[in-house]
Regions:
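Basic, short loop/linker segments at the boundary and entry of helix-turn-helix/winged-helix-like folds
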Residues: 28-73
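Short, positively charged, Gly/Tyr-enriched micro-motifs
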Residues: 63-143, 197, 250, 445
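Active-site-proximal, Lys/Arg-enriched surface segment
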Residues: 121-195
Length: 466
């Protein structure tokens, strides 16, 4: 027997229309109206103009009967509900009609014989896939630029933090049915350091074999074009983004870059030579958390006016890190494009880059952003795109009030049903308290008497009973 296909239909909130239907003995379904942190989060998105940005997502549909915001919202909430795939979105979608009310519409699963009328617009997980499948890396970059500009308007204090970090992470999709090949990709993420984590603000997708440097250069160019040169006051990058000419350009734009040196670089050799001079002073700092037993004794020393990196014409200050182990000593070098900078400042800036490493670990371990189902390229990009966006937006929401911290953790727990019931009638829904619903039924019992079994069935569905 062919498995029945699940479909979703869009509903508009209309309290008067639903109550009028109830007075006629008509009710198409009941769902629990869960309230939790997600309710406040929905209001946060609305109040800060994020939903308006979702409405502007670039699309290529010939028919546009379903609002764009519904496609974007579905994937934004997917990681918050810890749903592993689009099929799971179809199975669960939103448990809080309040959230959807904030967005201006609602949705409920259509069961066989559960709805009597036609004319509503079908929406299912396949529709989500078809919407995002044509999108490419530039589509998501353009959309996130719009989000970035909105965040800049709404949260100017975030950008005054001044310390940004950038790194890349790989993800993949397994081979699927009907000849769908596996996919291997990477995303270069540029974010701002905020409360012991990094909030992703702009990112660019690419095939896994793409080099990090052109991806990173393009991201910085887009931020400068959107927000102005110098908005990135301090940038922390990985060695994969080492390029003297680029660092010089950023210096002229007002951006100080901090980066680790490769072992074969002349500037590192110069710092090692200068460190042998008798007047060199070393400062002890806490040992690194590098899971080595015993942990090393770590010391740092600093240098200014470093000139042996010919490709970099920006002024350079350096920090040499020395780790003493029982049987050997290890060195590593870090430089910052600045006219002045002591070892402690450079070292502390360097250690902030590990916040970016923690971010990538959290997105993998707790948010499972890279645990993707077999899907087309555009869909894979969309799943990761909205997971990154959900992490940033939820952190900003949490920062506005006394909410449970989610930094470097998983999403908060799923909401549980509370006092209100989402009541559906025709193409409309509203939220009613149980007493309000029962009062209407008892008042108009003459029309409800013939629908006793239907209302009991609806209540059982509400309870989750078979």
């Amino acid at each position: 027997m062919k498995e029945r296909q699940r479909q979703w239909f869009i509903f508009v909130e209309n309290r008067q229309a639903v109550i009028e239907a109830l007075t006629r003995g008509e009710c198409d379904g009941l769902l629990p109206a869960a309230r939790s942190f997600l309710d406040g989060f929905a209001g946060f998105l609305l109040n800060h103009g994020i939903m308006a940005v979702f409405e502007a997502f670039p699309e290529q549909r010939a028919r546009q009967s379903i609002p764009v915001v519904f496609f974007c919202g579905s994937l934004l909430y997917r990681p918050l509900f810890q749903l592993p795939s689009l099929q799971a979105v179809g199975d669960v979608l939103f448990r809080s009609p309040y959230i959807l009310r904030q967005m201006g519409f609602n949705a409920v699963q259509i069961g066989q014989g559960f709805y009597r009328t036609n004319g509503r617009k079908p929406f299912d997980e396949e529709a989500v896939a078809e919407f995002f499948a044509p999108a490419d890396a530039d589509t998501f970059l353009a959309h996130q630029e719009q989000v970035l500009h909105q965040l800049y308007q709404e949260f100017p204090w975030l950008f005054r933090q001044g310390v940004w970090a950038m790194d890349s992470v790989s993800f993949s999709t397994p081979k699927g049915n009907h000849g769908l090949p596996e996919g291997r990709y990477k995303v270069c993420i540029l974010g701002v350091c905020y409360q012991d984590t990094v909030l992703p603000l702009l990112w660019l997708f690419a095939p896994e074999e793409a080099h990090d440097l052109p991806l990173g250069q393009r991201l910085v160019e887009r931020v400068e074009a959107a927000l102005g040169q110098g908005v990135i006051k301090n940038l922390l990058v990985d060695r994969a983004l080492l390029d003297g000419a680029w660092l010089t350009l950023l210096w002229h734009h007002g951006t100080h870059v901090t980066v680790s040196l490769r072992e074969n670089m002349d500037v590192l050799s110069d710092m090692l030579g200068l460190a042998r001079l008798g007047e060199t002073e070393w400062m002890e700092v806490p040992p690194p958390d590098n899971h080595r037993d015993p942990a090393p004794q770590r010391e740092i020393t600093g240098f200014t006016d470093l000139t042996s990196w010919e490709a970099c014409q920006a002024p350079l200050c350096g920090c040499l890190i020395r780790d003493h182990y029982p049987d050997h000593t290890e060195y590593q070098g870090v430089v910052m494009t600045a006219e002045a900078g002591d070892a402690k400042t450079i070292y502390e800036r360097h250690t902030q880059r590990w916040d970016h490493e923690e971010l990538l670990m959290s997105l993998t371990r707790y948010w499972h952003f890279d645990r993707l189902p077999p899907c087309r390229v555009g869909v894979a990009y969309a799943l990761v795109h909205f997971a990154l966006l959900a992490f940033t937006l939820l952190n900003l929401y949490q920062g506005e009030g006394d909410h449970t911290a989610i930094r470097n953790q998983g999403p908060p727990p799923l909401p549980l049903p509370e006092r209100e019931i989402a009541v559906y009638a025709g193409p409309y829904f509203t939220l009613l308290r149980p007493s309000e619903l029962m009062e209407i039924i008892f008042t108009y019992w003459d029309v409800w008497a013939d629908h006793r079994d239907a209302i009991l069935d609806a209540l059982k569905r509400f309870e989750g009973s078979p």
